[in-house]
């Protein structure tokens, strides 16, 4: 049986168990409530589409692109007339249009996200002022989950449906246009920043041009001045509509124009204002000249420097992360690799920690790779060493005086391709050097390999182990006419020509020639200011008795390259001047540095509601804030709002809130909900007896139910969860959240699973085609297998024990998991779910990692419409979801069906998932042509995409599922820190002190700038906001949680308990002392110091009386 067949067979087995349990009638539904879907068409029908639409989608997919299918389906649904009512009746048209736009949007978003359900509130046929009919699409906040492109296409779909139904254009009034202008400005000032901030004129142009009304529900309690407009139902902000206009139509204008032309939809020509080049090259040049004296705009990641999250490197700063192209087995899909030694030395970077970066893209997650270059550090004793070993990094990190170079950042070609960002010049590295040798005329003629194994399976590890000394490196360079080996190439561009000339004169004053270096003690150089030049060049050396000692090879190289003075030409870069005098070609070792700062910490933690309940059973305020059902039961009878269910037995007809009638045992029907008195003590006692559990001290419930029908969970489930120390989420499932990281290959040893177990799961051979016979072989992971964190494995083990308890004690069936340790869970099925989606993805546990993350195939993450730039997703045991998930428990508010497994994708089709995964590199080495293209400058990745092997080139073939190779090996996917320093430090003072201490070590960071950044973008705005919030706050009851804008005259809550402030004085003061301390210790901008003083005055005025205190005459003597 093939892999997908195995998954499907196991899924059917679990469904059979769940179906048998549900048939007992103890749950509201008699069948599992998560339908299966094998492909996009079935997911769409399962989520939103009318019955039978899956078949039609599959027919159209044979000859159309996905976008064309979406629009064709929309047209067919919009023009049908078999809805209740008369043909051409507006209600029928609205119903058709509503179904059409939701189904088409579901197709465009892979049938995964909740936007088709929640992002579009409704559609409506409305009146223009001239009496014609127009079409309005009401967007809600969750449209954000679809992304800008899908939101834009939803508007275009609305226009297509409008035309299909023969409706006129939307004709906005001047007041309606100005309402949008005001809302955009209010949204940014009062709510949050938009990804694209349109100007007022751009908003006016868009609203006049869009042929449908883009409107929506109120999303924020912020009132507008343009009030009481006849066609706008709310006087508050319509966030969904603004997102659709600004981040959709305007920001994605190029895509709309493209699709409008392809589908021959007229009326969108006005968008060329946004897509046309704004000026000619001459005008751009003039603009550049006129703005030469203007300050440069800050890099995006530097705009918000957060306390405790250090800046690792300023934009393009020398000594930052060196750009190196390639992919290791745990990088790609927005995650990028650095050396684990770098992670250990800086301590703020652990596996899965987010970084906000300068390029490419906005952010990433860091993962380890030990076949790239580690950091170069200066120790307190003056030694300069390159650290390429984790244990060495741990042993010396307290002795580090300066981090001269942070090491490589391994960036996949696909990361540039994703945004079609022009390629930056690559680092000069071993894998490039080897290909230059291979391409040389000398090699082609003589086949002299110099001991290098040139074949298509050549691995970087072999190159790194090559024993090449300096003389041999120069010999190879001269014979092959290729640049000098990277090992003997220094960071010449990081120093000036004057400094190199100074160093040249100094060295040749001590040593006559490079050959003399190999004589006794000639590599001992007296220490003076030239040491700093050698440090910045990145040359390792030791200090002993006031002498600098470097290796003979490095000194020979330095003197051979700097054999005469460099040209003083000011227009010439240092590396160009070096090449003019060097006997061999010298490449720039680090032509591109990447800046970045620490972002969100890595995470692996069980999903808990606040406070965390064991059962979705309401107990009101009868147990106070602890919400313990056992405590509430001591009250005897309590009054709560519950579902009203009527017994279906005609001889009984008793009303209750249970699925089974408590009197006759027949099924009940849900009718409504109402407040009622229940004997909780008896219910709880019966529940304990039903599951044969001795009385527990604590079983936590909820204050009230937020679902529409108010149907509670059976108390028995809560008791069994409490018994196994697990907690439910709002839909009845138990979840564990982890940071997403990609993985294309694993080693049985590193995931803690014996190879025999791996064989049982259908794995047969390693990446070299050899049979699996030990725990150390590298194996390509199957696309729906995942490696969860050890803490996730331990929590799921508890969940499995709960499920077995549930099957035995509640459903009176055989246990299923019988797991004694987490390894017993290997091979079992899970459902993965992203928070903004409504479709789970079937997965299988294949192992465990010590890191705080969930490793999975890039396809698995993309199937959830996620990448790996710090996204966090949930994992749940599939049988738990099938037994306990209930749509009835979902919140009735907008967005309630988001983050719920309304459908389960059981098979991942690479062609149907998010296309970001199509950019994943599959190359054993980066082609030489790509390296050369990076040197040209400004080359777009799309122009050279045919030179690379990636997923996109494999789609539709069997190779899309396997053979996704990597260029850079790593010995372990969990090398380096597992928890970043930010999470281990308890106080903000400790975090900031550590942040600034690291800034003092980093050559690529300005310490004063970091201090000012933390104050300006974090502490000062936070204090100002807290002062404002303190003065506007409500008071809160300590028992029932009721809130009051003003303290009642009685001074207490209506329930008789005390009232307290909801915002404490401490929250206002928390950053004041540390801000003052930083302003005194560092020479920061006087303006920032004044801001601190003004805030301090305001705080003192808030908490202390401004009345002058009477003084005695003694005070004046």
Swiss-Prot record:
<dbReference type="InterPro" id="IPR056171">
    <property type="entry name" value="PolC_DP2_central_dom"/>
</dbReference>
<dbReference type="InterPro" id="IPR004475">
    <property type="entry name" value="PolC_DP2"/>
</dbReference>
<dbReference type="Pfam" id="PF24846">
    <property type="entry name" value="PolC_DP2_cat"/>
</dbReference>
<dbReference type="InterPro" id="IPR056172">
    <property type="entry name" value="PolC_DP2_cat_dom"/>
</dbReference>
<feature type="compositionally biased region" description="Basic and acidic residues">
    <location>
        <begin position="279"/>
        <end position="294"/>
    </location>
</feature>
<keyword id="KW-0511">Multifunctional enzyme</keyword>
<keyword id="KW-0235">DNA replication</keyword>
<protein>
    <recommendedName>
        <fullName>DNA polymerase II large subunit</fullName>
        <ecNumber>2.7.7.7</ecNumber>
        <ecNumber>3.1.11.1</ecNumber>
    </recommendedName>
</protein>
<feature type="region of interest" description="Disordered">
    <location>
        <begin position="279"/>
        <end position="299"/>
    </location>
</feature>
<keyword id="KW-0540">Nuclease</keyword>
<dbReference type="Pfam" id="PF24844">
    <property type="entry name" value="PolC_DP2_central"/>
</dbReference>
<keyword id="KW-0808">Transferase</keyword>
<dbReference type="GO" id="GO:0006308">
    <property type="term" value="P:DNA catabolic process"/>
</dbReference>
<keyword id="KW-0239">DNA-directed DNA polymerase</keyword>
<dbReference type="GO" id="GO:0003887">
    <property type="term" value="F:DNA-directed DNA polymerase activity"/>
</dbReference>
<keyword id="KW-0548">Nucleotidyltransferase</keyword>
<comment type="subunit">
    <text>Heterodimer of a large subunit and a small subunit.</text>
</comment>
<comment type="similarity">
    <text>Belongs to the archaeal DNA polymerase II family.</text>
</comment>
<dbReference type="Pfam" id="PF03833">
    <property type="entry name" value="PolC_DP2_N"/>
</dbReference>
<keyword id="KW-0238">DNA-binding</keyword>
<dbReference type="GO" id="GO:0008310">
    <property type="term" value="F:single-stranded DNA 3'-5' DNA exonuclease activity"/>
</dbReference>
<dbReference type="GO" id="GO:0003677">
    <property type="term" value="F:DNA binding"/>
</dbReference>
<dbReference type="InterPro" id="IPR016033">
    <property type="entry name" value="PolC_DP2_N"/>
</dbReference>
<dbReference type="GO" id="GO:0006261">
    <property type="term" value="P:DNA-templated DNA replication"/>
</dbReference>
<keyword id="KW-0378">Hydrolase</keyword>
<keyword id="KW-0269">Exonuclease</keyword>
<comment type="function">
    <text>Possesses two activities: a DNA synthesis (polymerase) and an exonucleolytic activity that degrades single-stranded DNA in the 3'- to 5'-direction. Has a template-primer preference which is characteristic of a replicative DNA polymerase.</text>
</comment>
């Amino acid at each position: 049986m093939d892999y997908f067949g195995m998954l499907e067979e196991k899924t059917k087995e679990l469904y059979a168990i769940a179906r048998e349990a549900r048939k007992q009638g103890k749950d509201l539904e008699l069948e599992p409530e998560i339908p299966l879907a094998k492909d996009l068409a079935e997911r769409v029908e399962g989520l939103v589409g009318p019955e039978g639409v899956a078949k039609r989608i599959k027919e159209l997919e044979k000859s159309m692109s996905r976008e064309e299918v979406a629009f064709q389906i929309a047209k067919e649904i919009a023009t049908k007339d078999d809805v209740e009512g008369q043909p051409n009746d507006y209600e029928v048209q609205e119903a058709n249009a509503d179904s059409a736009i939701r189904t088409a949007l579901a197709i465009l978003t892979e049938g995964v996200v909740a936007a088709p359900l929640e992002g579009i509130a409704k559609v409506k046929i409305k009146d223009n002022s001239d009496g014609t009919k127009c079409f309005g699409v009401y967007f809600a906040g969750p449209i954000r989950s679809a992304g800008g492109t899908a939101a834009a296409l939803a508007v275009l779909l609305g226009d297509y449906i409008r035309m299909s139904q023969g409706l006129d254009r939307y004709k906005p009034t001047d007041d309606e246009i100005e309402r949008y202008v005001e809302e955009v400005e209010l949204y940014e000032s009062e709510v949050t920043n938009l990804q694209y901030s349109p100007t007022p004129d751009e908003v006016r142009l868009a609203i006049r041009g869009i042929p449908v009304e883009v409107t929506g529900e109120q999303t924020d309690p912020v009132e507008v001045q343009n009030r009481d407009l006849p066609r706008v139902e709310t006087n508050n902000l319509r966030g969904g509509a603004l997102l659709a206009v600004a981040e959709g139509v305007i920001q994605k204008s190029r895509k709309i124009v493209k699709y409008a032309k392809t589908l021959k939809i007229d009326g969108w020509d006005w968008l060329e204002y946004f897509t046309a080049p704004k000026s000619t090259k001459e005008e751009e040049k003039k603009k550049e000249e006129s703005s030469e004296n203007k300050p440069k705009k800050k890099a995006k990641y530097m705009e918000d420097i957060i306390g405790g999250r250090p800046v690792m490197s300023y934009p393009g700063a020398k000594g930052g992360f060196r750009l190196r192209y390639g992919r290791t087995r745990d990088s790609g899909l927005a995650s990028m690799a650095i050396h684990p030694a770098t992670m250990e030395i800086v301590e703020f970077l652990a596996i899965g920690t987010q970084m906000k970066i300068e390029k490419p893209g906005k952010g990433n997650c860091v993962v380890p790779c030990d076949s790239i270059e580690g950091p170069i550090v200066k120790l307190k004793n003056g030694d300069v060493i390159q650290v390429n070993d984790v244990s060495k990094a741990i042993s010396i990190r307290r002795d580090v005086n300066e981090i001269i170079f942070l090491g490589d950042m391994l960036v996949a070609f696909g990361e540039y391709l994703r945004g079609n960002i022009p390629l930056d010049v690559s680092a000069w590295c071993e894998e490039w050097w080897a290909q230059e040798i291979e391409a040389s005329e000398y090699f082609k003629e003589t086949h002299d390999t110099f001991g290098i194994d040139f074949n298509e399976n050549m691995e970087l590890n072999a190159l790194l182990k090559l024993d090449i000394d300096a003389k041999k490196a120069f010999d190879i360079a001269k014979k092959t006419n290729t640049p000098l080996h990277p090992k003997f190439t220094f960071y010449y561009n990081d120093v000036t020509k004057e400094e190199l000339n100074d160093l040249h004169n100094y060295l040749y004053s001590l040593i006559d020639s490079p050959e003399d270096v190999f004589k006794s003690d000639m590599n001992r150089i007296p220490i003076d200011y030239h040491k700093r030049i050698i440090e910045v060049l990145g040359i390792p050396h030791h200090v002993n008795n006031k002498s600098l000692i470097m290796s003979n090879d490095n000194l020979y190289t330095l003197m051979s390259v700097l054999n005469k003075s460099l040209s003083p030409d000011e227009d010439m870069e240092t590396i160009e001047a070096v090449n003019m005098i060097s006997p061999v070609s010298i490449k720039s070792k680090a032509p591109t540095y990447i800046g970045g700062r620490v972002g969100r910490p890595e995470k692996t933690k069980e999903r808990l509601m606040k406070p965390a309940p064991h059962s979705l059973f309401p107990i009101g305020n009868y147990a106070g804030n602890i919400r313990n059902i056992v405590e509430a039961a001591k009250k005897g009878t309590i009054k709560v709002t519950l579902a009203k269910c009527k017994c279906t037995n005609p001889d009984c007809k008793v009303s209750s809130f249970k699925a089974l009638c408590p009197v006759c045992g027949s099924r009940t029907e849900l009718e409504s909900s109402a407040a009622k008195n229940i004997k909780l003590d008896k219910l709880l006692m019966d529940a304990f007896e039903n599951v044969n559990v001795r009385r527990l001290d604590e079983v936590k419930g909820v204050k009230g139910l937020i679902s529409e029908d108010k149907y509670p969970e059976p108390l028995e489930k809560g008791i069994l969860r409490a018994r196994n120390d697990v907690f439910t989420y709002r839909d009845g499932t138990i979840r564990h959240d982890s940071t997403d990281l990609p993985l294309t290959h694993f080693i049985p040893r590193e995931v803690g699973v014996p190879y025999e177990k791996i064989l049982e799961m259908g794995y047969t051979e390693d990446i070299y085609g050899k049979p699996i016979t030990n725990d150390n072989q590298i194996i390509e992971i199957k696309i729906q297998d995942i490696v969860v964190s050890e803490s996730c494995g331990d929590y799921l083990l508890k969940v499995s024990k709960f499920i077995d308890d549930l099957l035995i004690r509640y459903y009176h069936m055989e246990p299923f998991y019988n797991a004694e340790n987490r390894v017993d869970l290997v091979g079992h099925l899970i459902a993965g779910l992203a928070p903004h989606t409504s479709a789970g993805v079937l997965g299988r546990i294949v192992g465990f990692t010590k890191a705080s993350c969930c490793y999975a195939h890039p396809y698995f993450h993309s199937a959830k419409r996620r990448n790996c730039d710090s996204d966090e997703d949930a994992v749940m045991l599939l049988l738990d979801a099938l037994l306990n998930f209930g749509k009835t428990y979902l919140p009735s508010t907008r967005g309630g069906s988001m983050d719920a497994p309304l459908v389960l994708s059981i098979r991942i089709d690479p062609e149907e998932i998010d296309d970001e995964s199509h950019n994943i590199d599959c190359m054993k080495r980066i082609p030489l042509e790509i390296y050369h293209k990076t040197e040209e400058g400004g080359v777009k990745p799309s122009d050279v995409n045919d030179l690379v092997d990636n997923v996109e080139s494999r789609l539709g073939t069997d190779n899309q599922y396997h053979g996704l190779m990597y260029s850079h090996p790593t010995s372990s996917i969990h090398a380096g820190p597992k928890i970043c320093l930010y999470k281990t430090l308890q106080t903000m003072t400790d975090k900031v002190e550590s942040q600034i201490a690291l800034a003092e070590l980093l050559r690529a960071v300005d310490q004063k700038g970091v201090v000012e950044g933390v104050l300006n973008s974090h502490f000062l705005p936070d204090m100002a906001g807290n002062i404002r919030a303190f003065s506007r706050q409500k008071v809160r009851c300590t028992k029932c949680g009721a809130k009051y804008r003003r303290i009642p005259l009685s001074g207490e809550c209506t329930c008789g308990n005390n009232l307290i402030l909801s915002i404490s004085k401490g929250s206002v003061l928390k950053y004041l002392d540390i801000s003052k301390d930083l302003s005194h210790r560092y020479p920061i901008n006087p303006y920032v110091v004044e801001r601190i003083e003004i805030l301090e005055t305001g705080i003192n005025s808030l908490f202390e009386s401004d009345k002058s205190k009477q003084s005695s005459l003694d005070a004046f003597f």
